[in-house]
Amino acid sequence: RHRGLNFAEVDIHVITATDLRLERDPHRTRLLETAKRLRPRLLPLDPLVRLQGIDENNEGEVAQLLAYFRLLQRRLDLSVMLVHHTRKNAAGGVAAGQGLRGSSDIHAFGDSNLYLRRTRQRLVLSNEHRAAPASPPVYLELVATNAETTHLEVIAELHQEQRRGLQE
């Protein structure tokens, strides 16, 4: 139990298939039919790289995969959450999405994007939104006072001069 929520009572389903390739059938059809049956509000796909076999740099292949995710979103009235990684040499800063691996279509797909990165032994959470200005980045810390309530906690908001330092 955390913050009044008993996780044993939450209706969560996990896909445990050993092989899931969402760029092709029958995998696409099975996911669509499963989601129709379960009616999730949120479909987390984590990590994206393990759920497909396309060339992430090929815009055509990426566009087809993202079109399938958009179809799921619209047909089933759910939110699709993609967990994706940055390039190893990606610079931080205001446009964190520019550092994502692969085609820029992956960055453009998101209506709201959250970016978590480590800098100087701290976690920084930044965001981008399609229809609203981004809020200031924040520092997060993993708080583990006891095993039952381990959580991330906002410990500070980054001020303008600190944000400039992240971009360098």
Give the location of each predicted region.
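Alpha-helical structural motif
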Residues: 27, 106, 123, 165-166
